[in-house]
Protein backbone atom coordinates (compact mmCIF):
# COMPACT_ATOMS: atom_id res chain seq x y z
CA UNK A 1 0.00 0.00 0.00
CA UNK A 2 1.04 3.64 -0.35
CA UNK A 3 1.97 4.78 3.15
CA UNK A 4 2.46 8.10 4.86
CA UNK A 5 6.01 9.43 5.09
CA UNK A 6 8.16 11.40 7.47
CA UNK A 7 11.92 11.93 7.85
CA UNK A 8 14.28 9.35 9.34
CA UNK A 9 16.00 11.95 11.50
CA UNK A 10 15.99 15.65 12.34
CA UNK A 11 18.00 18.03 10.19
CA UNK A 12 18.72 21.77 10.40
CA UNK A 13 19.81 24.58 8.10
CA UNK A 14 20.36 28.30 8.43
CA UNK A 15 19.51 30.94 5.85
CA UNK A 16 18.33 34.50 5.44
CA UNK A 17 14.75 35.74 5.60
CA UNK A 18 13.85 37.32 2.25
CA UNK A 19 11.97 40.23 3.81
CA UNK A 20 13.60 40.66 7.22
CA UNK A 21 17.17 40.06 6.08
CA UNK A 22 17.71 38.25 9.40
CA UNK A 23 19.41 34.88 9.86
CA UNK A 24 16.81 32.16 10.35
CA UNK A 25 17.39 28.64 11.63
CA UNK A 26 15.13 25.91 10.27
CA UNK A 27 14.87 22.45 11.85
CA UNK A 28 12.84 19.61 10.31
CA UNK A 29 11.67 17.01 12.84
CA UNK A 30 10.01 13.61 12.17
CA UNK A 31 6.36 13.49 13.27
CA UNK A 32 3.82 10.68 13.90
CA UNK A 33 1.24 9.56 11.31
CA UNK A 34 -1.68 11.95 10.70
CA UNK A 35 0.24 14.92 12.14
CA UNK A 36 0.41 16.77 8.84
CA UNK A 37 2.86 19.64 8.42
CA UNK A 38 3.18 21.79 11.55
CA UNK A 39 5.29 24.95 11.79
CA UNK A 40 6.63 25.78 15.25
CA UNK A 41 7.82 29.31 16.07
CA UNK A 42 10.60 28.72 18.61
CA UNK A 43 11.66 32.38 18.85
CA UNK A 44 8.58 33.39 20.86
CA UNK A 45 8.47 33.40 24.69
CA UNK A 46 6.36 30.23 24.44
CA UNK A 47 6.71 28.13 21.25
CA UNK A 48 3.59 28.29 19.08
CA UNK A 49 2.50 25.49 16.72
CA UNK A 50 0.80 26.47 13.47
CA UNK A 51 -0.67 23.57 11.50
CA UNK A 52 -0.75 24.06 7.76
CA UNK A 53 -4.29 24.46 6.42
CA UNK A 54 -5.84 26.69 3.74
CA UNK A 55 -7.96 28.69 6.23
CA UNK A 56 -4.80 30.02 7.92
CA UNK A 57 -3.36 31.56 4.74
CA UNK A 58 -4.32 35.14 5.55
CA UNK A 59 -1.60 37.15 3.83
CA UNK A 60 -0.71 36.48 0.20
CA UNK A 61 0.73 39.83 -0.87
CA UNK A 62 4.29 38.58 -1.35
CA UNK A 63 4.17 34.91 -0.35
CA UNK A 64 1.87 32.36 1.25
CA UNK A 65 1.80 33.37 4.92
CA UNK A 66 0.03 31.50 7.70
CA UNK A 67 -1.52 33.78 10.34
CA UNK A 68 -3.17 32.39 13.48
CA UNK A 69 -6.11 34.02 15.26
CA UNK A 70 -3.62 35.37 17.81
CA UNK A 71 -1.52 36.98 15.06
CA UNK A 72 1.39 34.51 14.99
CA UNK A 73 2.81 34.45 11.46
CA UNK A 74 4.87 32.02 9.41
CA UNK A 75 5.66 33.42 5.97
CA UNK A 76 7.28 32.39 2.70
CA UNK A 77 6.31 28.75 3.21
CA UNK A 78 5.56 27.87 -0.43
CA UNK A 79 9.04 26.73 -1.56
CA UNK A 80 9.44 24.44 1.46
CA UNK A 81 5.89 23.11 1.03
CA UNK A 82 6.68 22.49 -2.64
CA UNK A 83 9.70 20.38 -1.65
CA UNK A 84 7.55 18.39 0.81
CA UNK A 85 5.03 17.70 -1.97
CA UNK A 86 7.77 16.70 -4.40
CA UNK A 87 9.26 14.31 -1.86
CA UNK A 88 5.92 12.89 -0.69
CA UNK A 89 6.35 14.03 2.94
CA UNK A 90 3.10 13.85 4.93
CA UNK A 91 4.13 14.45 8.54
CA UNK A 92 6.72 16.88 9.85
CA UNK A 93 7.30 19.51 12.49
CA UNK A 94 9.17 22.53 11.13
CA UNK A 95 10.85 24.58 13.84
CA UNK A 96 11.73 28.10 12.73
CA UNK A 97 13.35 30.97 14.64
CA UNK A 98 11.58 33.82 12.82
CA UNK A 99 8.31 34.82 11.17
CA UNK A 100 9.49 33.60 7.76
CA UNK A 101 11.17 30.56 6.24
CA UNK A 102 14.70 31.28 4.92
CA UNK A 103 14.77 31.98 1.19
CA UNK A 104 17.94 29.86 0.53
CA UNK A 105 18.68 30.21 -3.23
CA UNK A 106 15.11 31.21 -4.16
CA UNK A 107 14.14 27.70 -5.31
CA UNK A 108 13.14 24.44 -3.61
CA UNK A 109 16.40 22.61 -4.42
CA UNK A 110 18.17 23.34 -1.07
CA UNK A 111 15.13 22.01 0.80
CA UNK A 112 15.14 18.85 -1.32
CA UNK A 113 18.81 18.40 -0.42
CA UNK A 114 17.90 18.59 3.28
CA UNK A 115 15.17 15.96 2.81
CA UNK A 116 17.53 13.68 0.88
CA UNK A 117 20.22 14.05 3.54
CA UNK A 118 17.82 13.24 6.40
CA UNK A 119 16.24 10.34 4.50
CA UNK A 120 12.56 9.40 4.38
CA UNK A 121 10.75 6.58 6.13
CA UNK A 122 7.33 5.05 5.50
CA UNK A 123 4.88 5.03 8.40
CA UNK A 124 2.26 2.40 9.33
CA UNK A 125 -0.70 4.42 8.06
CA UNK A 126 -2.15 4.82 4.57
CA UNK A 127 -1.37 8.04 2.71
CA UNK A 128 -4.58 9.95 1.98
CA UNK A 129 -4.95 11.68 -1.35
CA UNK A 130 -7.61 14.17 -2.39
CA UNK A 131 -9.20 13.10 -5.66
CA UNK A 132 -10.96 15.90 -7.55
CA UNK A 133 -14.30 14.63 -8.92
CA UNK A 134 -15.73 17.85 -10.38
CA UNK A 135 -14.12 20.92 -11.89
CA UNK A 136 -13.64 23.90 -9.59
CA UNK A 137 -12.60 27.34 -10.86
CA UNK A 138 -11.85 30.80 -9.51
CA UNK A 139 -11.63 33.82 -11.81
CA UNK A 140 -10.87 37.47 -11.19
CA UNK A 141 -10.27 40.14 -13.86
CA UNK A 142 -8.55 37.95 -16.41
CA UNK A 143 -6.68 35.85 -13.83
CA UNK A 144 -7.96 32.30 -13.33
CA UNK A 145 -7.11 28.97 -11.74
CA UNK A 146 -8.94 25.67 -11.87
CA UNK A 147 -8.81 22.04 -10.79
CA UNK A 148 -10.19 19.32 -13.05
CA UNK A 149 -10.58 15.57 -12.62
CA UNK A 150 -7.47 13.77 -13.86
CA UNK A 151 -6.01 10.36 -13.06
CA UNK A 152 -2.67 11.71 -11.90
CA UNK A 153 -1.16 15.12 -11.18
CA UNK A 154 -0.62 17.59 -13.98
CA UNK A 155 -0.04 21.36 -14.03
CA UNK A 156 -0.48 23.77 -16.94
CA UNK A 157 0.39 27.40 -16.23
CA UNK A 158 0.81 30.52 -18.30
CA UNK A 159 2.18 33.92 -17.35
CA UNK A 160 1.93 37.19 -19.23
CA UNK A 161 4.65 39.81 -18.95
CA UNK A 162 5.15 42.25 -21.79
CA UNK A 163 8.88 42.51 -21.20
CA UNK A 164 11.91 41.63 -23.35
CA UNK A 165 13.31 39.09 -20.84
CA UNK A 166 10.00 37.20 -20.84
CA UNK A 167 9.32 37.53 -24.55
CA UNK A 168 12.50 35.55 -25.26
CA UNK A 169 11.12 32.47 -23.45
CA UNK A 170 7.98 30.33 -23.50
CA UNK A 171 5.41 31.72 -21.06
CA UNK A 172 3.27 28.56 -20.96
CA UNK A 173 4.43 25.22 -19.56
CA UNK A 174 2.62 21.92 -18.99
CA UNK A 175 4.17 19.38 -16.63
CA UNK A 176 2.58 15.95 -16.26
CA UNK A 177 4.26 14.25 -13.33
CA UNK A 178 3.56 10.83 -14.85
CA UNK A 179 6.33 11.70 -17.32
CA UNK A 180 8.32 14.52 -15.75
CA UNK A 181 10.49 14.77 -12.64
CA UNK A 182 9.80 17.45 -10.04
CA UNK A 183 13.38 17.20 -8.82
CA UNK A 184 15.00 17.67 -12.23
CA UNK A 185 12.58 20.00 -13.98
CA UNK A 186 10.87 22.17 -11.36
CA UNK A 187 12.71 22.25 -8.02
CA UNK A 188 15.66 24.38 -9.23
CA UNK A 189 13.55 27.21 -10.71
CA UNK A 190 14.13 30.42 -8.72
CA UNK A 191 11.82 33.20 -7.66
CA UNK A 192 12.06 36.39 -9.71
CA UNK A 193 11.40 40.10 -9.38
CA UNK A 194 11.90 43.38 -11.14
CA UNK A 195 14.49 45.93 -10.06
CA UNK A 196 11.82 48.60 -9.49
CA UNK A 197 9.90 46.16 -7.25
CA UNK A 198 13.03 45.44 -5.23
CA UNK A 199 13.59 49.17 -4.68
CA UNK A 200 9.93 49.67 -3.70
CA UNK A 201 10.04 46.78 -1.21
CA UNK A 202 13.25 48.00 0.40
CA UNK A 203 11.75 51.48 0.80
CA UNK A 204 8.88 49.81 2.68
CA UNK A 205 11.08 47.67 4.93
CA UNK A 206 10.68 44.48 2.88
CA UNK A 207 12.98 42.43 0.68
CA UNK A 208 15.98 43.21 2.89
CA UNK A 209 17.39 39.71 2.39
CA UNK A 210 16.90 39.68 -1.38
CA UNK A 211 19.96 39.50 -3.64
CA UNK A 212 21.20 38.00 -6.88
CA UNK A 213 22.08 34.92 -4.80
CA UNK A 214 18.44 34.12 -4.02
CA UNK A 215 16.34 35.59 -6.84
CA UNK A 216 16.36 36.32 -10.54
CA UNK A 217 16.40 40.12 -10.81
CA UNK A 218 15.28 41.81 -14.03
CA UNK A 219 15.83 45.43 -15.09
CA UNK A 220 13.99 47.20 -17.92
CA UNK A 221 15.36 44.74 -20.45
CA UNK A 222 17.64 42.01 -19.13
CA UNK A 223 18.20 39.43 -16.41
CA UNK A 224 20.88 40.93 -14.14
CA UNK A 225 22.17 37.64 -12.69
CA UNK A 226 25.61 37.01 -14.24
CA UNK A 227 24.96 33.25 -14.55
CA UNK A 228 21.70 33.84 -16.44
CA UNK A 229 18.73 31.47 -16.22
CA UNK A 230 18.77 27.81 -15.15
CA UNK A 231 16.07 27.03 -17.75
CA UNK A 232 14.96 29.13 -20.74
CA UNK A 233 11.47 29.18 -19.19
CA UNK A 234 12.60 29.41 -15.55
CA UNK A 235 10.01 32.13 -14.78
CA UNK A 236 6.95 30.01 -15.48
CA UNK A 237 8.61 26.91 -14.02
CA UNK A 238 8.98 28.82 -10.76
CA UNK A 239 5.27 29.65 -10.88
CA UNK A 240 4.65 25.88 -11.11
CA UNK A 241 6.96 25.33 -8.12
CA UNK A 242 4.96 27.94 -6.18
CA UNK A 243 1.63 26.42 -7.20
CA UNK A 244 2.72 22.95 -6.04
CA UNK A 245 3.63 24.41 -2.65
CA UNK A 246 0.45 26.47 -2.40
CA UNK A 247 -1.73 23.46 -3.30
CA UNK A 248 0.02 21.23 -0.75
CA UNK A 249 -1.27 23.54 1.97
CA UNK A 250 -4.48 21.47 1.64
CA UNK A 251 -2.57 18.79 3.56
CA UNK A 252 -2.77 15.96 1.01
CA UNK A 253 -1.48 15.25 -2.49
CA UNK A 254 -4.06 16.08 -5.17
CA UNK A 255 -5.18 13.66 -7.86
CA UNK A 256 -6.17 16.34 -10.34
CA UNK A 257 -5.13 18.61 -13.18
CA UNK A 258 -4.35 22.16 -12.07
CA UNK A 259 -4.27 24.96 -14.62
CA UNK A 260 -4.01 28.69 -14.36
CA UNK A 261 -3.31 31.96 -16.12
CA UNK A 262 -1.35 34.71 -14.31
CA UNK A 263 -2.10 32.99 -11.02
CA UNK A 264 -0.46 33.74 -7.70
CA UNK A 265 -0.64 32.80 -4.03
CA UNK A 266 -3.98 34.53 -3.40
CA UNK A 267 -5.79 32.82 -6.28
CA UNK A 268 -4.26 29.43 -5.48
CA UNK A 269 -5.55 29.74 -1.92
CA UNK A 270 -9.01 30.87 -3.03
CA UNK A 271 -9.17 27.79 -5.24
CA UNK A 272 -8.31 25.46 -2.34
CA UNK A 273 -10.94 27.10 -0.14
CA UNK A 274 -13.56 26.77 -2.88
CA UNK A 275 -12.66 23.09 -3.35
CA UNK A 276 -13.06 22.36 0.37
CA UNK A 277 -16.35 24.30 0.43
CA UNK A 278 -17.67 22.06 -2.40
CA UNK A 279 -17.80 18.58 -0.79
CA UNK A 280 -19.30 16.97 -3.90
CA UNK A 281 -16.22 18.04 -5.91
CA UNK A 282 -13.72 15.82 -4.10
CA UNK A 283 -13.15 12.68 -2.05
CA UNK A 284 -10.35 11.10 -0.05
CA UNK A 285 -8.56 8.18 -1.71
CA UNK A 286 -6.01 5.63 -0.47
CA UNK A 287 -4.34 2.73 -2.26
CA UNK A 288 -3.77 -0.79 -0.92
CA UNK A 289 -1.75 -1.66 -4.02
CA UNK A 290 0.74 1.03 -5.10
CA UNK A 291 0.16 0.00 -8.71
CA UNK A 292 -3.45 1.15 -8.38
CA UNK A 293 -2.26 4.70 -7.72
CA UNK A 294 -1.89 7.04 -10.70
CA UNK A 295 1.55 6.76 -12.27
CA UNK A 296 2.31 10.39 -11.28
CA UNK A 297 2.85 9.09 -7.76
CA UNK A 298 5.09 6.14 -8.72
CA UNK A 299 8.05 8.50 -9.08
CA UNK A 300 8.28 9.63 -5.46
CA UNK A 301 11.90 9.48 -4.30
CA UNK A 302 12.60 6.08 -2.73
CA UNK A 303 13.53 5.50 0.87
CA UNK A 304 17.28 5.50 1.32
Swiss-Prot record:
It catalyses: a UDP-3-O-[(3R)-3-hydroxyacyl]-N-acetyl-alpha-D-glucosamine + H2O = a UDP-3-O-[(3R)-3-hydroxyacyl]-alpha-D-glucosamine + acetate. Zn(2+) binds at residues 79, 238, 242. Disulfide bonds: none annotated. GO terms for cellular component: membrane. The active site is at residue 265. Its EC number is 3.5.1.108. This is UDP-3-O-acyl-N-acetylglucosamine deacetylase. The lineage of its organism: Bacteria, Pseudomonadati, Pseudomonadota, Betaproteobacteria, Neisseriales. Catalyzes the hydrolysis of UDP-3-O-myristoyl-N-acetylglucosamine to form UDP-3-O-myristoylglucosamine and acetate, the committed step in lipid A biosynthesis. Belongs to the LpxC family. It comes from the Bacteria. Its cofactor is Zn(2+). Pathway: Glycolipid biosynthesis; lipid IV(A) biosynthesis; lipid IV(A) from (3R)-3-hydroxytetradecanoyl-[acyl-carrier-protein] and UDP-N-acetyl-alpha-D-glucosamine: step 2/6. It comes from Chromobacterium violaceum (strain ATCC 12472 / DSM 30191 / JCM 1249 / CCUG 213 / NBRC 12614 / NCIMB 9131 / NCTC 9757 / MK). Keywords: Hydrolase, Lipid A biosynthesis, Lipid biosynthesis, Lipid metabolism, Metal-binding, Zinc. One of its GO terms (molecular function) is metal ion binding.
